[in-house]
């Protein structure tokens, strides 16, 4: 059994028990019906859908233990099994050609642990969209990590090309400042040099 919870315009409409499969399902309709002014600032439907799709990919990659299914306009855009395999999620998100061109990597020191996959040079791209890393289960961006990744690939990829990387990083919260940006996407490290070295060595080897 499960629970059906309906909210309209920020107000509770109903809360009732019902039969349901395991998991959580969100159905979102007419998101800006009561704030039409805000909807005017949105980009095209295709662009906004792309943002949502990217978010779902990030969630699936950072939490391979959870099964995700993203349906947009009755079409399945993403489906992951939740079997704890990051490589299986990469296959679901990026396809077979990417998944078969990966090398598994791992690294551990006294304050951080790194696991994940790096791509062979032939699957590098002309932008950084394939550079994904997650700290304590959260998708983030950080200049130190980006530099370490790209320095690690120097001499292996052509100029103006960027590698495929999917790294899961675990570290003590005391070594990490997540309050740099309201969305907590940007982070700072107390031990930047050691973080750089760890990422560089993980990628380079």
Predicted regions and their residues:
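N-terminal phosphate-binding caps/lids of nucleotide- and nucleic-acid-binding domains
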Residues: 1-205
């Amino acid at each position: 059994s499960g629970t059906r919870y309906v909210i309209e315009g920020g107000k509770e409409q109903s809360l009732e028990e019902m039969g349901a499969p395991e998991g959580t399902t969100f159905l979102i309709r007419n998101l800006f019906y009561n704030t039409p002014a805000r909807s005017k600032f949105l980009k095209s439907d295709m662009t906004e859908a792309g943002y949502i799709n990217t978010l779902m990919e990030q969630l699936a990659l950072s939490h391979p233990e959870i099964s995700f299914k993203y349906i947009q306009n009755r079409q399945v855009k993403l489906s992951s099994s939740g079997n704890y395999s990051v490589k299986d999620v990469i296959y679901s998100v990026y396809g077979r050609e990417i998944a078969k061109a990966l090398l598994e990597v791992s690294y551990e020191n006294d304050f951080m642990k790194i696991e994940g996959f790096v791509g062979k040079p032939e699957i590098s791209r002309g932008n950084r969209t394939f550079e994904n890393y997650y700290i304590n289960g959260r998708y983030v961006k950080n200049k130190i990590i980006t530099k370490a990744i790209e320095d690690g690939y120097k001499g292996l990829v052509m100029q103006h090309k960027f590698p495929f990387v999917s790294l899961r990083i675990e570290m003590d919260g005391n070594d990490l400042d997540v309050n740099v940006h309201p969305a907590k996407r940007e982070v700072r490290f107390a031990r930047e040099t050691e973080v750089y070295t760890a990422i560089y060595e993980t990628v380079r080897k």
